[in-house]
Amino acid sequence: MALVVQKYGGSSLESAERIRNVAERIVATKKAGNDVVVVCSAMGDTTDELLDLAAAVNPVPPAREMDMLLTAGERISNALVAMAIESLGAEAQSFTGSQAGVLTTERHGNARIVDVTPGRVREALDEGKICIVAGFQGVNKETRDVTTLGRGGSDTTAVALAAALGADVCEIYSDVDGVYTADPRIVPNAQKLERLSFEEMLELAAVGSKILVLRSVEYARAFNVPMRVRSSYSNDPGTLIAGSMEDIPMEEAVLTGVATDKSEAKVTVLGIPDKPGEAAKVFRALADAEINIDMVLQNVSSVEDGTTDITFTCPRSDGPRAMELLKKMQQQGDWTNVLYDDQVGKVSLVGAGMKSHPGVTAEFMEALRDVNVNVELISTSEIRISVLIREDDLDKSAKALHEKFQLGGDEEATVYAGTGR
């Protein structure tokens, strides 16, 4: 008997009809001889609606109370899924994140999982019940306050539970039936991938693929939890994410796909003294403010005045905070000016095959040249090339790269209604 953890996204649970459909799939998995644990996201746009409601009563709501509010969304879908399963004649028991033993750090709004002690879930499984766990939430061990895990936290909840329970697989259900060589909404002939290594999926998640959140893939890799991305609208087996890139024979390594990201902003700090410790001053201030940095470029030092410029990208949502912080430091005479640009985007090519295919970077740049796209920043890893370009050029760049590296197929991809969550 296998233990299967299934996670259902908000689009899969947005109505009573879809909840009943999900319940039928869950019960079928149980009847096939499996133990089943289900992690639920909030229904449809519930989380966004709760955020709007909070803003209407308090423009700056307390973080603790915001977590108390937002976790209600998952508890609602949790209970409804359990009810639907019971209506089909199977036994189900729902749990909040706290009841399921999801222990987190104290940071409200973006807590990290530190441990999972799913004793009550294990007991219910032993009694033959289907266990339904509210995603996106946990509890701080010291304060006992409810916490939330940030956007995409239900994916992380599912993988963490799968690891703690020793599950055979963690299935992530949404409105897409797998991981594609590109977003089918941008590149119609994108092809579904049957299998990816953890490293390839980590790179795709890090550079903009919305199918899985980065933290969930990091967790799966750390605890070697196989993941399968599937659609709740079909019976297609989807994409399996498992194993290491090192296990892929060199001759079989391929270029995996193209991803785009519209969530970053570019910041340039001008006139920084070109001497030891000055760049560290910039990035220490940003780190202390918990602002993540992605791409970085430092210009050649100016001979005339001994200064340099540093350009970096950060989440667009953190851009105003970064600018406020750096402008304050500018007033202290640390540098001459700070520039901000939020009309940028990142396009990336990922694949284990880069290690064995000379000339990938040249072909990448030629593809962008052919569609008249200018590159502003470049970042690479062993299996990834990313460039920063104008946001308006993202779609045509993705299409050009996808065609250049022959990643497409003869048929158009099937796109179900929804957003990929």
UniProtKB/Swiss-Prot annotation:
EC identifiers of the protein: 2.7.2.4
Catalytic activity: L-aspartate + ATP = 4-phospho-L-aspartate + ADP
UniProt KW Methyltransferase keyword: no
Example GO biological process: diaminopimelate biosynthetic process
MF GO annotations: aspartate kinase activity; ATP binding
Record keywords: Amino-acid biosynthesis, ATP-binding, Diaminopimelate biosynthesis, Kinase, Lysine biosynthesis, Nucleotide-binding, Repeat, Transferase
Residue stretches making up the ACT domain: 267-343, 349-421
Binding site for ATP: 7-10, 41, 174-175, 180-185, 210
Contribution to the catalysis, annotated site positions: 7, 74
Pathway given in the UniProt record: Amino-acid biosynthesis; L-lysine biosynthesis via DAP pathway; (S)-tetrahydrodipicolinate from L-aspartate: step 1/4; Amino-acid biosynthesis; L-methionine biosynthesis via de novo pathway; L-homoserine from L-aspartate: step 1/3; Amino-acid biosynthesis; L-threonine biosynthesis; L-threonine from L-aspartate: step 1/5
Gene Ontology cellular component annotations, sorted alphabetically: cytosol
CDD domains named in the record: AAK_AKii-LysC-BS, ACT_AKii-LysC-BS-like_1, ACT_AKii-LysC-BS-like_2
Glycosyltransferase recorded as keyword: no
UniProt-listed Pfam families: AA_kinase, ACT_9
Residue numbers binding substrate: 25-30, 45-49, 74, 125-126, 151-154, 274-279, 292-294, 298, 360-361, 374-375, 381-382
Function per UniProt: Catalyzes the phosphorylation of the beta-carboxyl group of aspartic acid with ATP to yield 4-phospho-L-aspartate, which is involved in the branched biosynthetic pathway leading to the biosynthesis of amino acids lysine, threonine, isoleucine and methionine.
Family per similarity comment: Belongs to the aspartokinase family.
Known partners and oligomeric status: Tetramer consisting of 2 isoforms Alpha (catalytic and regulation) and of a homodimer of 2 isoforms Beta (regulation).
Record's protein name: Aspartokinase
Organism lineage: Bacteria, Bacillati, Actinomycetota, Actinomycetes, Mycobacteriales
